[in-house]
């Protein structure tokens, strides 16, 4: 039984998590079982295309990417998907191609947008007493 070379990576944004399985194939990219061309909303579809367009479609010609995304809203999911795809491509090139092409990919991604490879660490601030939220306070009366 021959095993297909594959890597598994993830991307996160807020509470959205995308897991990408990258393996040798013929250039298919699927998100939750449907082609990448059907990602909704349409305006954010180009955000998902960014990793593909940055390095050229020739890098994706001989690999298949399957992405499963859960949690969060539409925008968070799109950012998690693009991060998972970018990280998956870098990991695949590191493991199965060569170190030089991996470094070229990393350089291209980080020079364009750092969040393609590094997760956004911002999280909601916890609520404190004396107000309705993290920073807002209840109204104060002097009389």
Swiss-Prot record:
Superkingdom of source: Eukaryota
Biased composition (Basic residues): 134-143
Family matches, as InterPro entries: Ribosomal_Su5_D2-typ_SF, Ribosomal_uS9, Ribosomal_uS9_CS, Ribsml_uS5_D2-typ_fold_subgr
Region described as Disordered: 123-143
GO cellular component terms, semicolon-separated: cytosolic small ribosomal subunit
UniProt keyword terms in alphabetical order: Ribonucleoprotein, Ribosomal protein
GO BP term (any one): translation
GO molecular function, one term: RNA binding
Family: Belongs to the universal ribosomal protein uS9 family.
Protein's UniProt name: Small ribosomal subunit protein uS9
Natural source organism: Kluyveromyces lactis (strain ATCC 8585 / CBS 2359 / DSM 70799 / NBRC 1267 / NRRL Y-1140 / WM37) (Yeast)
């Amino acid at each position: 039984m021959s095993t297909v070379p594959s890597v598994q990576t993830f991307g996160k944004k807020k509470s959205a998590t995308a897991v990408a399985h990258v393996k040798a194939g013929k250039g298919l990219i699927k998100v939750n079982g449907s082609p990448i061309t059907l990602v909704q909303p349409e305006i954010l579809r180009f955000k998902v295309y960014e990793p593909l367009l940055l390095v050229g479609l020739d890098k994706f010609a001989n690999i298949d990417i399957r992405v499963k995304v859960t949690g969060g809203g539409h925008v968070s999911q799109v950012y998690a998907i693009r991060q998972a795809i970018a990280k998956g491509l870098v990991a695949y090139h590191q493991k199965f191609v060569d170190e030089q092409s991996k470094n070229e990919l990393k350089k291209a991604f980080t020079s364009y947008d750092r969040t393609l490879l590094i997760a956004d660490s911002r999280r909601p601030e916890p609520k404190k007493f004396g107000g309705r939220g993290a920073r807002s306070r209840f109204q104060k009366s002097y009389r």
